[in-house]
């Protein structure tokens, strides 16, 4: 598949630094020079912020011909939404209620994802989201990319959603390739030897009919700890010289 990517409401500190009115607290905000998960995200109760999201998505589809737009959905803290009068008003107006193991703020995320999906579907595009978009009321036409193991992908396929398997248990190539790391360049952690990559079965746990929803698998090489091209080439080198089965990684 081909996709363009956008985090529509989290990791937005750069946006909030420029447009503090789009945040729940009003700022001031600073651009973060590092990586991580931060509490300040877009205010979903602010209609101008939601229009900003749609404007960005509109620009993306003008630039990229991709059928799919990956809009994120992972690692979005709820703390600001929980304490934000505008977000709480949106929750009340939309009838978003806690239940089924999910909070009203979880369903506020679902509202945002569904709104983005409607915007893109109306323009002939489809969304992909990380498996956290299952936490609430998943957008009805969304393709789910499962990174927290395979459980989210299995659940999504059982629900009738298309799935891309990218489990960190098998497909995160920024992990160390060996348990003996003393001579290895810095990595984020973990241990993912080639043998573990080969063990990936993207359709395990699914019926033949459910397995049809698995579009394939994706390996990720995140670069928080990878500063040079040489390091990029080193990290997956043990994998990329192998011919992996086409039913495992695509």
Where are these regions (language model features)?
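Single conserved hydrophobic/aromatic residue that forms the stacking wall/gate
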Residues: 1-5, 9, 241, 246-250
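Aromatic- and acidic-residue-enriched carbohydrate-binding clefts of CAZyme catalytic domains
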Residues: 12-48, 80-104
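Generic structural motif recognizing short loop/turn segments at the entrances and edges of beta-strands
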Residues: 11-12, 20, 38-40, 140-142, ...
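Glycine-rich, aromatic-flanked loop segments that form ligand/cofactor-binding clefts
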Residues: 3-21, 162-164
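Core alpha/beta catalytic barrel or barrel-like domain that forms the active/cofactor pocket
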Residues: 3-12, 28-35, 67-81, 127-131
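Substrate-binding groove of N-acetylhexosamine-processing glycoside hydrolases
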Residues: 46-68, 75, 89, 93-238, ...
């Amino acid at each position: 598949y081909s996709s363009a990517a956008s985090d529509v409401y989290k990791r937005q500190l750069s946006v909030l630094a420029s447009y503090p009115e789009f945040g729940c607290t009003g700022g001031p905000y600073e651009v973060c020079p590092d990586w991580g998960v931060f509490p300040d995200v877009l205010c979903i109760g602010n209609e101008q912020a939601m229009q900003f999201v749609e404007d960005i998505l509109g620009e993306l589809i003008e630039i990229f011909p991709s059928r799919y737009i990956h809009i994120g959905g992972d690692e979005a803290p709820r703390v600001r939404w929980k304490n934000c009068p505008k977000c709480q008003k949106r929750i009340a107006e939309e009838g978003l209620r806690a239940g089924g193991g999910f909070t009203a703020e979880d369903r506020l995320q679902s509202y945002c994802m569904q709104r983005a999906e409607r915007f893109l579907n109306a323009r002939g595009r489809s969304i992909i989201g990380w498996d956290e978009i299952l936490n609430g009321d998943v957008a009805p036409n969304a393709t789910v990319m499962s990174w927290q193991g395979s459980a989210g992908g299995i659940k999504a396929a059982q629900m009738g959603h298309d799935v891309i398997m990218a489990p960190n248990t098998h497909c995160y190539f920024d992990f160390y390739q060996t348990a003996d790391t003393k001579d290895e360049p810095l990595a984020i952690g973990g241990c993912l030897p080639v043998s573990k990559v080969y063990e990936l079965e993207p359709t395990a746990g699914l019926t033949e009919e459910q397995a049809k929803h698995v579009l394939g698998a994706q390996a990720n090489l995140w670069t928080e700890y990878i500063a040079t091209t040489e390091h990029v080439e080193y990290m997956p080198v043990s994998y990329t010289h192998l011919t992996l089965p086409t039913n495992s990684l695509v």
